Amino acid sequence: TVLISLQESWAIKEDHVIIQAEFYLNPEESAEFMFDFDGDEIFHVDMQKKETVWRLPEFGHFASFEAQGALANMAVMKANLDIMIKRSNNTPNTNVPPEVTLLPNKPVELGEPNTLICFIDKFSPPVISVTWLRNGIPVTDGVSQTVFLPRDDHLFRKFHYLPFLPTTEDVYDCKVEHWGLNEPLLKHW
């Protein structure tokens, strides 16, 4: 069960939008709190380390955010979710399966370092498992990812990255698992 809180102003039409997105997921007891400007992450709060993580370190030189505020919001979200679950008679949320695209960061040249991008889009709830495979074997070295990024339609998107050295022998896969999928989805490159 997921409780999502997206706060943005719809009162007037503006050229730019800042979104404060937060969610709490039960029974996994995972949470996310982030700020977004025109679709790009400004920062998120690492709930384990209890600290603000700026998407670009330079952002932290011009602004500040106390992670404790997000942690307090999560405690309220958890309490609200528990109440809503009881009131809804434990009716589950609808699982919306993701759309997945796999592409290189730049034009591929054999032997030249590059990055594969697994773009996972239009899914809910914000729970996903991604595994990178090279020739069918899991790869973890150098792998990175974004937090869950909110969309205007209240679905989510997320990016996963794998640095690689292109060869003619290697085959790469981005394996995505989500509650809305009957089986894992593999995208090949």
Model regions and ranges:
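Terminal anchoring/processing modules of extracellular glycoproteins
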Residues: 1-189
